Amino acid sequence: MPMSRPDSAVSLLPDYSLRAHNTFGFDARARVAARIGSPGQFASLARDPRVAGLDRLVLGGGSNVVFTRDFDGLVLLDEIRGRALVREDDGAWYVEAGGGENWHAFVEWTLAEGMPGLENLALIPGTVGAAPIQNIGAYGLEMKEHFASLRAVELATGELVEFDAARCAFGYRDSFFKRDGRGRFAIVAVTFRLPKAWTPRIGYADVARELAARGIDARAARARDVFDAVVAIRRAKLPDPLALGNAGSFFKNPVIDAQAFAALRAREPDIVSYPQPDGRVKLAAGWLIDRCGWKGRALGAAAVHERQALVLVNLGGASGADVLALAHAIRRDVLGRFGVELEMEPVCL
């Protein structure tokens, strides 16, 4: 797969502003930063005496991080580019992309190349390298369903390591890289398996409604139709981070057991829920937050978005600590009313 630039000595950027590298727009600073354009550059920094002993943080699009303070260490800006069809067989295409590739642009490229499958994940902010960490998902599809493998550099040793799905240990918005592997690896390339036998994934009512509004029979929808519908839905519901700082969905949709759900539904008959294959029930976190009266409310310059209660926004001048205080207030109220604990999606530093 082509990389954006060859291995070369890495220039260090002292006292580096991270404002442009996090979608909340927080003006945190790194003690030192480095732009990384190849796996070899990640590896070279493992042995570089200039940064020995420093904590390390890999940043892609910065769409899943909340800086509550400056980062007193080395920030590695993943700019590894490249995307290609690496092989195919009778059943599927295998496509690989660099960790620094923009996720949405990569999804659009797969469709332009006639390889559908990722269209439900359109317009999710961030990079290809961040997608496995979070096991991103939307509108009835999780990334893990099309994941084949990834390559990552172990930051402490510079070793290039291959991960299959089992080793990644994917869960709901979760993976090995958010648990035991947190902070240990930089994902430099991801390979996806896109089956040639494609059918539209249109189980979510929002997608079916958007297709109908466009005069498209859901059963005959093409991948591009689904892509366009998802993009339209997300643009209508979610603020553009360039206009209003945010990190997308701030809370995971909680999953509870059937007994707890039955008791909750007895008190809240109109609660929004989604039965899971294992018998548990997923709740809509946005609905819980809205019912607690938080939609559209602000604490200082941090606020809950007026159209989507799952999204916390920076109205201008908010700090990471302000957003975190708002998140804690929301979690407290949801727990008090529903007995359900919300888990935050972004990493707070």
Curated annotation (Swiss-Prot):
Pfam families on file: FAD_binding_4 (PF01565), MurB_C (PF02873)
Superkingdom, natural source: Bacteria
Keyword Ion transport: no
GO BP annotations, alphabetical order: cell division; cell wall organization; peptidoglycan biosynthetic process; regulation of cell shape
Boundaries of every FAD-binding PCMH-type domain copy: 26-197
Catalytic activity: UDP-N-acetyl-alpha-D-muramate + NADP(+) = UDP-N-acetyl-3-O-(1-carboxyvinyl)-alpha-D-glucosamine + NADPH + H(+)
Keywords: Cell cycle, Cell division, Cell shape, Cell wall biogenesis/degradation, Cytoplasm, FAD, Flavoprotein, NADP, Oxidoreductase, Peptidoglycan synthesis
Active-site positions on this chain: 173, 249 (proton donor), 345
Catalytic activity, EC: 1.3.1.98
Recorded GO MF terms: FAD binding; UDP-N-acetylmuramate dehydrogenase activity
Compartments it resides in: Cytoplasm
NCBIfam families given in the database record: murB (TIGR00179), PRK00046.1 (NF000755)
Job description of the protein: Cell wall formation.
Family (UniProt): Belongs to the MurB family.
Cited HAMAP family: MurB
Protein name stated in the entry: UDP-N-acetylenolpyruvoylglucosamine reductase
Species of provenance: Burkholderia pseudomallei (strain K96243)
Gene this chain is encoded by: murB
